[in-house]
Amino acid sequence: MIMSKISKLVTHPNLFFRDYFLKKAPLNYGENIKPLPIETSSHSKKNTAHKTPVSSDQPIEDPYPVTFPIDVVYTWVDSDDEKFNEERLKFQNSSTSETLQGKAESTDIARFQSRDELKYSIRSLMKYAPWVNHIYIVTNGQIPKWLDTNNTKVTIIPHSTIIDSQFLPTFNSHVIESSLYKIPGLSEHYIYFNDDVMLARDLSPSYFFTSSGLAKLFITNSRLPNGYKNVKDTPTQWASKNSRELLHAETGFWAEAMFAHTFHPQRKSVHESIEHLWHEQLNVCRQNRFRDISDINMATFLHHHFAILTGQALATRTKCIYFNIRSPQAAQHYKTLLARKGSEYSPHSICLNDHTSSNKNILSNYEAKLQSFLETYYPDVSEAEILLPTKSEVAELVKHKDYLTVYTKLLPIINKQLVNKYNKPYSYLFYYLGLSARFLFEETQQEHYRETAEENLQIFCGLNPKHTLALKYLADVTLTSQPSGQ
């Protein structure tokens, strides 16, 4: 011990005298000063009450707010539009692509059908993400019948605004998605939605982007099959494999990870870089009127992998419920989602997909069940919708026998299909239109009133089969239509 102290004095005199004087006159920190907890390894028996992990695998929460504007972009089509269907069939029948003819899902009408999902998706945005800066709806020129075009938060963007005329008309979502970044006035940060995707709980801007502007991209465990594209692949796999080959040739990275069927945060500058790198290949894709083997999946595959590889995005997870509305299991999914609404078990989003119309095992009344679910989960009318008259407002007019006013007010609403005939909460509109038409027929004996009364009372009674007064009125107008002597 003495030799070690002598050695310390010779080699480190400063430390020797420091320790000597501290022992003679220790520092006094005062009675209120307590020692800090000592971080020890998990094997130490000392100070176990104060063990603190030095590192953690948990991500650090971004302490800074997202302050930049975030837009939302939808793609939408109205399959009930006669002009649209005429053009679709014309180009579909004139297609010479062997791969197109062998892929029913490329042209199947289910891909284009609209059941007002867009209306409910916007309702979900207004309720669960009211911070959204602006909403753009990209269409082939159609306008949703329920949309209030005077609303300043929603803008319709025709295909002709963002796609060169040589590639129009197009019925290929990959073509449309490749040009979304060209929307005039679009913010650098935006979220791409299909019209069948809805939010299911409150989400903040930081769920989609970091405060520094990185996009958060929602990765899954699914993998794009290895190997190059072949005729057995789906059209989505064709487009994703083509995108993978472009990415591999440029970066050496072989992309396999797929992303969730949900919302897709986007960076406009990433799309501009992709256009600059692969303009020629994108234009080959844009020549395809329908999904085809030379497509590129820009919005939900190429953008995502390129953004992550170039440090403009990061991969993360989300909770998304995705199912086919025609599936027999859909009814149970609706019940589960409604039961979990507002709880911690609610998903972040719902994707109500419609697979090919050739599906043989189909849920009975699947359209009515879908409408019932949507109206129950998203009952609050958004500011983007044309306001419908309330039940009490119409009843007051009927009370004063102002049948012509009721008729002229409700007929355009029903004719424009602002209300779906499967939507029971709004069935009163069919009832009062039928009722007013019934009394107008009684007064004037004009056949078109009787036909309107019969048609709308039938719809109402189908949804409300025990409504005795409606059944009586329906019987009256139906009997009147029978030729005398029968």
UniProtKB/Swiss-Prot annotation:
Q: What is its EC number?
A: 2.7.-.-
Q: Where is this region: Disordered?
A: 38-58
Listed A to Z, the keywords are: Exopolysaccharide synthesis, Transferase
Q: Which GO terms describe its biological process?
A: polysaccharide biosynthetic process
Q: Does the keyword Aminoacyl-tRNA synthetase apply?
A: no
Recorded hits in Pfam families, A to Z, give:
Stealth_CR1 (PF17101), Stealth_CR2 (PF11380), Stealth_CR3 (PF17102)
The GO terms this record gives for MF are: transferase activity, transferring phosphorus-containing groups
Query: What is the enzyme's class at the highest EC level?
Result: transferase
- What function does this protein fulfil? Part of a group II capsule biosynthesis locus.
> Other remarks?
Stealth proteins are part of a protein family that is conserved from bacteria to higher eukaryotes. Family members were first identified in microbes as proteins that help pathogens to elude the host innate immune system. Microbial stealth proteins are involved in the biosynthesis of exopolysaccharides. Stealth proteins are predicted to function as hexose-1-phosphoryltransferases.
The entry sums up its family as follows: Belongs to the stealth family.
**Protein name per its UniProtKB record:** Capsular polysaccharide phosphotransferase XcbA
